[in-house]
């Protein structure tokens, strides 16, 4: 994958990491895996958008992040009763652990996938009580969020800021929190590696994308080759 990214970069292609991880963990990961080239952008916490500033540090790209923080503060002000009931459910009916940021519950960690499935069923039923309340699942973790801010909408905002339309954006993902960016609205070219969860494979198939036979990064390279990006330069970002 590194060789492919280097080749695409030489042809003017921009690339971004779109992840549920926080910005600090992105920097740690880039150092740990010794990436030969830095991403042009990082989209973090499933909703934030950053680019390199003049001094080389990651900084907010536009006002998206500030709008995101404001929307989440307002959401939490309206969600007290719902969050109280979520905590009660976790304590009463599960072995899951709530995750706090200060005194605010921002998500949870379940014991296993089966328990997480059951918790998600509960969240789906209850979240309708608060307009805009959503959650993002990744393995046995869930993060509470505003439905207007996801990997998908963050990717669309990046496209708007860079002047790149969805017709020229490729996106690949493998887990539940990738679903919002793989529905065909934010990227015309979508794919997933062979080790993706079934929900992602189904989404990619419905949107006319490519479900790779190879796993992990090899699956991403397979998808880029499938779409002709490695030989014809059809994908601009």
Regions found by a protein language model. Give the residues of each.
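Active-site phosphate-binding/coordination module
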Residues: 1-91
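A generic structural signal for alpha->beta connector loops
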Residues: 12, 39, 130-132, 187, ...
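A structural signal for isolated positions on well-ordered beta-strands in alpha/beta enzyme cores
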Residues: 14-16, 107, 170, 191
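Short, charged/polar "capping" segments at the starts of alpha-helices
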Residues: 26, 115-117, 198-201
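Residues at the C-termini of beta-strands that transition into short coil/loop
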Residues: 43-46, 53, 139, 194, ...
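Conserved acidic, metal-coordinating active-site core of Asp-based
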Residues: 83-170, 176-184
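Mg2+-dependent phosphoryl-transfer enzymes with acidic/Ser/Thr/Gly-rich catalytic loops
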Residues: 145, 152-237
